[in-house]
């Protein structure tokens, strides 16, 4: 059983924890959030026993092998960096990093910490549609170019347009949100 720590207490994390539970291979042990109370409120129903509002304490005192990072995009680099420095396995939501310099920094850090691993949680590579497209491409004799359009209407967009901003990190450049950064990977 792999011990799992999480950074980010949101609907994506709920979905990931539900999926992890179905494998029978993960046990949630530690939760980091901006407040310890929120970490406990989120993590207790999943069986977590350690709750943190300090990233340093989370990594120093948390009992986990794998950390799942589902925070605002702009925070991924620093959180993944700390995980690597603590020789953790990392599953980070997409986009893992917001620019090439961050990726290169993590790549260098991984070379110095061979026990650590980083995986981007890019679910599209596991969908039937992706595999169907992959098979179709294999059957084509020559590919000289492609134009593929993927559209997704955000369930949060109407609230933002109405002036209600319950998710400040979703559509702002400050948190590396918006259509290109958040959905552009698809």
Annotate each PLM feature.
Residues 1-46:
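N-terminal Rossmann-like dinucleotide-binding module
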Residues 127-186:
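Predominantly a Rossmann-like dinucleotide-binding segment in NAD(P)-dependent oxidoreductases
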Residues 105-124, 142-146:
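Rossmann-fold dehydrogenase core element
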Residues 27-30, 65-67, 118, 177-178:
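Short active-site oxyanion
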Residues 46-109:
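Beta-loop-alpha module in the N-terminal Rossmann-like domain of NAD(P)-dependent dehydrogenases
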Residues 92-104, 117-131:
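Rossmann-like NAD(P)(H) cofactor-binding subdomain of soluble oxidoreductases
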Residues 23, 46, 61-62, 113, ...:
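Acidic-histidine catalytic/liganding microenvironments
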């Amino acid at each position: 059983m792999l011990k799992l720590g999480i950074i980010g207490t949101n609907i994506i994390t709920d979905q990931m924890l539900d999926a992890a539970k179905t494998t029978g291979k993960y046990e949630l042990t530690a939760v980091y959030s901006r407040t310890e109370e929120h970490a406990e409120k989120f993590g207790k129903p999943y069986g977590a026993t350690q709750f943190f509002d300090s990233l340093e304490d989370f990594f120093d005192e948390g009992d986990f092998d794998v950390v799942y990072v589902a925070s605002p995009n702009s925070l991924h680099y620093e959180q993944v960096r700390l995980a690597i420095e603590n020789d953790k396995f990392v599953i980070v939501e997409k986009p893992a990093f917001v620019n090439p310099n961050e990726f290169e920094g993590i790549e260098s850090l991984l070379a110095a910490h061979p026990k650590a691993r980083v995986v981007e949680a890019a679910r599209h590579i596991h969908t039937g549609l992706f595999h169907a497209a992959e098979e179709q491409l294999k059957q084509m004799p020559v590919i000289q170019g492609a134009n593929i359009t993927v559209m997704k209407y955000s369930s949060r967009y109407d609230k933002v347009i109405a002036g209600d901003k319950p998710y400040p990190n979703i559509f702002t450049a400050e948190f590396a949100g918006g259509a290109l950064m958040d959905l552009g990977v698809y």
